[in-house]
Design a protein with these regions (language model features):
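Non-catalytic interaction/clamp surfaces of large macromolecular machines
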Residues: 2-4, 8-43
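Phosphate-handling DNA/RNA-contact segment within nucleic-acid enzymes
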Residues: 1-7, 11-13, 55-188
Length: 188
């Protein structure tokens, strides 16, 4: 329980950090991408989108907040560098950040999108952790659950990714969730 609570606090602090980065005046490439996808500021706020500006600042921020190194690593938001033994780096370094929030409204992971063409996948999720299993989570389940409680739902639209979900939600199709690139599982 202590470990789980610590990890959830780290992920919540990371989400706030990314959100502050997006609004810092230093996230021009991230803002340009958001504008190119025609997302409104209210949509960006509703989904808590953020920005990782580099590989170093998130780990340092979390350490400065007094979180334990072991818990920071166990959160999946930060990893050890392959190039520099013992150095902590942001697992989503440089990406546009999509917080993944569970049905209980806890930030459990992050999806990140690279902003320029690369030789690797455009999207990357936090690795599986004690609080995040990709095959058991749906992106936007938190907002869908609130909508179901408020108005009831007859249908759910299932899509593959974050941007599909956000774009449809903004267009008025608020009964949408994403499987985050995995095949639909029984748990989902």
């Amino acid at each position: 329980k202590r470990k789980r609570d610590a990890i959830l606090k780290i992920l919540r602090a990371s989400a706030r950090f990314y959100l502050n980065n997006l609004n810092s005046g230093h996230a021009d490439a991230h803002i340009d991408y958001i504008l190119s996808r025609k997302l409104s500021s209210s949509t960006v706020r509703k989904f808590g989108l953020g920005a990782s500006l580099d590989f170093k600042s998130l780990p340092q921020y979390l350490l400065d907040q007094g979180f334990r190194r072991e818990d920071i690593l166990d959160s999946g938001a930060v990893v050890e560098s392959d190039r520099h033994a013992g150095r902590l780096i942001d697992a989503q370094g440089g990406r546009l950040i999509f917080p993944i929030i569970n049905a209980l409204d806890d930030v459990v992971a992050f999806g990140g999108r690279v902003l320029e063409k690369m030789d690797f996948a455009k999207y990357k999720n936090t690795r599986e952790t004690s609080v995040f299993n990709k095959s058991k989570n749906l992106y936007n389940i938190n907002l869908l659950k609130k909508q179901k409680k408020a108005t009831g739902l007859k249908n759910i639209i299932m899509v593959e990714g974050y941007m599909d979900t956000i774009s449809l939600y903004q267009a008025g199709f608020t009964n949408v969730v994403a499987s985050m690139g995995t095949a639909l599982t029984k748990e989902q």
